[in-house]
Curated annotation (Swiss-Prot):
Gene that encodes it: glyQS
Cystine crosslinks: none
Species whose genome carries this gene: Alkaliphilus oremlandii (strain OhILAs)
Protein name: Glycine--tRNA ligase
Task of the protein: Catalyzes the attachment of glycine to tRNA(Gly).
Keywords (A to Z) from UniProt: Aminoacyl-tRNA synthetase, ATP-binding, Cytoplasm, Ligase, Nucleotide-binding, Protein biosynthesis
Amino acid sequence: MATEKTMEKIVSLAKSRGFIFPGSEIYGGLANTWDYGPLGVELKNNVKKAWWKKFIQQSPYNVGLDAAILMNPKTWEASGHIGGFSDPLMDCKKCRSRFRADKLIEDYMHSQNEETVVDGWSNQQMKTYIEEKEIVCPECGAKDFTDIRQFNLMFKTFQGVTEDSSTEIFLRPETAQGIFVNFKNVLRTSRKKVPFGIGQIGKSFRNEITPGNFTFRTREFEQMELEFFCKPGEDLEWFNYWKEFCKNWLLNLNLTEENLRIRDHAEEELSHYSKATTDFEYRFPFGWGELWGVADRTDFDLKQHSEHSGEDFTYQDPITNEKYVPYCIEPSVGVDRVALAFLVDAYDEEVIDEKDTRVVLRLHPALAPFKAAVLPLTKKLKDQALELYETLSENYMVDYDEAGSIGKRYRRHDEIGTPFCITFDYDSLEDQCVTIRHRDSMEQERIQISELTTYLNEKLKF
């Protein structure tokens, strides 16, 4: 019988096993900052590798990019971030606590089992709703709020030795704009033709007012974004193609389909640049949370940058000579969020019998921090086991573990998601075979050492 999966259990495992630590912990921490430990950095890197493999490496359409975090501020004027990238804030007049108005409303709706979309509401609509429903301050219970005002989410800093408006720059709030400003550079040097895509993985920063839920919403985060450029009129076809592609990527990495829902935005929810948007939402223990967004951004971004920079982003079809500004389809996913979803989804407490329950992370082998662990049956077999470890570690991330009983070592690796434990015993000296123990089934089989690499290559495929 399965036990309840809670965020407390996930966070406890992540901290105790070296997946994720609180940031700056020895100085009391810094709110909503997290450091990825030895296992966490492997999980996160494996998520990024899996995305890059399917979206870039194996796609005949797409190429990669790594654009700078710091950009000319005119970039953010053109994209609309300086003027319109903000959250609606209000303060409780009694206790001076600060809240996002839309989040207050969403939390209230959740408590009432209502399904209403707040995106796109004006400040006045939100204020009226809060007053009519008599929504109270979550901190003190008062019903006396300030008017709603907009708060820009970009982190501002200065470049150079002086601090004035002429040296003001921003940490990027998204990776997409670095792709748009490099559109012509990539098109020219990669010799691609429309349709084609540019993908990148990188850090972004947003001064969120209500970050939380572990690594789900943080001020510093990593994105995996693809900007796919196509001919106007073919955009909805490509929009549906990338929606299906994203869904298959998640399911092929063993995310449970019943924990995933796909929600198309209503017209009133759409961003000013979007013709169509779909959110992939995952059912976390704290509720449904947005995992991935796929948007039809039309030609908005290229036209904005053309207008503000004077650069012509018109594309000429080499066969028909037709000229147009390409439309753009954007699948955008947060690395931290999707890694958390995989971690939550994989967590299982399996009841073996009345006295025995094992914790196991049923991660897809491609995502597992360690692909295998080499375990000598006794320390007397250490030299031979280490030799095997060194051979395997040339191709895979492998652990070597000789501490404790073999049963305890198995359970330890179940808990961190290692799909295969390889035991080197005394028989191995004679028959040159090892015992492979499978994480999910706990079944064991004997395999020739000479066949191990071929065996693991097949099992670790993605």
